[in-house]
Structure formats: C-alpha cells, structure tokens
Regions:
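Iron-sulfur cluster-binding electron-transfer modules in prokaryotic oxidoreductases
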Residues: 1-219
Length: 219
C-alpha cells in the first residue's frame, strides 16, 4: 500500500481558483507517480477527489510534464466500489456469495443516491450493479444534485436554499418507500450528510454497507 504524505487532497481550496490554492492542490498530486509507476492504482472513496484526478488536473497541470502526470492519475484512479467490481469481474468472484444481501440486518431493500461527480466521471453504475448482483432490491434517485453541492449547504446563509433543492431527493425517497422502508445508501460526504440531516435517518456509504456483509473471520 502506498499512502500520500498529505492527509488532505485540497479539493476544496483548489476550487478557490487562486494561484496559491491551485499550486497547493498540484503539489499534493506529486506523491502519486512513484506509486503508479510501481504498479499500483489509486483507490478513492470521495467522488470529488476522483473528479480532480480524472478531470480537473487536466486544466491545472498545463505543461507537457503536467499532462503526463494527469494522464497517469486519470488512467489509474478509481472509485472504491468501481475498483472492487472490476476486480470481482476479472477474478470471477460471485457478489451474491461474497456480499449476500440476506445477511444485512436491516433488509434487502435499498434506496441509492449517487454523487453528481460520480455521474460526471462515469463511476456511478458500478455501485448499483454490484448491489443488485449481491441480491439487493435497489431503487435509485435521478436528481442531479442533493442540494448540498460540496460545502455550499454547510454555510448558514445557504442552508434554506440547500434544503429546498434537496426536497426533490427527499420526495423520491418517500415515493420509493411506498411499498415499505428502504435502507438509505449514498456516495460522498456531502450527499450522505444531506440525506442524514434532511430525513433524520441513518445513511450508509456503499463501502460501509458492503463491509457489514462480509463474513466475520474468527482470529
């Protein structure tokens, strides 16, 4: 395992678009090439960070050397569940045996909301596919934004607007539960927080839900 020296990817400050902030974000990425050249991939759990590696660094790393760095990051960076599903397909692992939905204590009916950045970079389908393959009954949202929009909804002056935008998502949850309750699953910190605070419900990350289904090994 190759871990970055920095604890933060600076995705929030890169969004500020000042030279100092952009340089800070670029410096963070320099840890990755040695890891990638050593045959490793970059596995991420936050969609906004994945979007930086697959899209944003093309703009930020403008020179020829920077473009090579961007291409390596783009081609070797994956959402955690996307990476897991690709590995399972390549090795023939059976999702229904490895992650049997019947093992989940809250039932097999899920409502899954994917992060907007997942949709942008194309990593969203893998989670839904894996969950269905495991035996879950998955209802999905089709809203573009949960209303949180990164750090937007955390700001006091935008809270009411954030909640108003989120009503479409909350309504879709209610409609999906017309036949009975569903376990809420969301990718990304902001979407997770919006659903949890807006509906006053427990919300699972996909990786968290899948981890709970693994058999407990006796050590």
């Amino acid at each position: 395992m190759c871990r970055p020296a920095s604890r933060a990817c600076n995705v929030s400050i890169v969004g500020g678009n000042t030279k100092t902030r952009i340089d800070s974000g670029i410096r963070w990425a320099t840890w990755a090439p040695p890891c990638i050249e050593d045959g490793r991939d970059v596995v991420l759990i936050e969609p906004s960070v994945l979007a930086m590696f697959r899209l944003d660094y093309r703009r930020l790393l403008a020179d020829a050397e920077g473009q090579l760095l961007f291409e390596r990051l783009r081609d070797h960076s994956f959402d955690a569940v996307e990476y897991l599903w690709a590995f399972m397909q390549g090795t023939g692992l059976d999702a229904a045996k490895l992650f049997p939905a019947s093992r989940h204590p809250l039932g097999t009916r899920l409502f899954y909301h994917s992060h907007c950045q997942q949709k942008t970079v194309g990593s969203a389908p893998a989670t839904e596919i894996l969950l269905r393959a495991a035996g879950f009954d998955v209802a999905t949202s089709n809203v573009e934004c949960c209303g949180m929009a990164g750090s937007f909804g955390y700001k006091k002056e935008y809270y009411d607007l954030s909640m108003a935008v989120g009503q479409d998502l909350f309504q879709q949850v209610a409609e999906a539960e017309s036949g009975g309750p569903r376990v809420l699953v969301a990718t990304g910190t902001s979407c997770h927080e919006q659903l949890a605070s807006g509906l006053k419900r427990q919300v699972f990350y996909p990786t968290e839900l899948l981890a709970a289904l693994l058999p407990q090994l006796e050590g």
